[in-house]
């Protein structure tokens, strides 16, 4: 069963170590459907009828549901933004990196909307709802996330303006 789930996510690395492009064509075939948004960087999807929790690789949104911790600045806004990008029923293309799962058992993925090819992880950073979170060996888009976050910070976008203290 796990093999089927992992096979549904495509690995962007080739034998030469290169990665795929970051914006995918709108005609890309979906391999997952949104069931819910848990918070700004975690979603629930179905893959071939099996429900999975997915952690968006390379980004970190402020916490809203971490046990014994207060809701962080801009956490509710980040969750709402992700929910607006990914309404229930949205077709997705999930792309994996080196590791399939995080220590909490969540599937790790770069997430694309198939309707328009939007790279969701990157859009969340670009709009100031997340900071980059680089955890090796899952680093295929790390430089892009860092550069995008710098631009959002320079423009005082989202959390970069609201959470300065």
Regions found by a protein language model. Name each.
Residues 2-165:
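Small beta-barrel nucleic-acid-binding modules, primarily SNase/OB-fold domains
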């Amino acid at each position: 069963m796990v093999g089927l789930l992992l096979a549904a996510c495509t690995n962007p690395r080739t034998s030469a170590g290169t990665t795929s492009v970051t914006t995918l064509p709108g005609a890309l075939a979906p391999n997952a459907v949104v069931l819910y948004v848990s918070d700004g960087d975690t979603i629930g999807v179905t893959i071939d009828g099996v429900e999975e929790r997915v952690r968006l690789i390379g980004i970190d949104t402020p916490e809203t549901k971490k046990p014994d911790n207060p809701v962080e600045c801009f956490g509710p806004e980040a969750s709402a933004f992700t929910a607006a990008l990914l309404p229930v029923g949205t077709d997705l293309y999930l792309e994996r990196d080196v590791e399939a799962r995080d220590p909490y058992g969540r599937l790790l993925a770069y997430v694309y909307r198939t309707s328009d090819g939007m790279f969701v992880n990157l859009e969340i950073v670009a709009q100031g709802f997340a900071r980059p979170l680089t955890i090796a060996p899952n680093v295929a888009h790390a430089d892009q996330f860092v550069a995008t976050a710098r631009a959002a910070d320079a423009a005082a976008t989202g959390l970069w303006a609201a959470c300065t203290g």
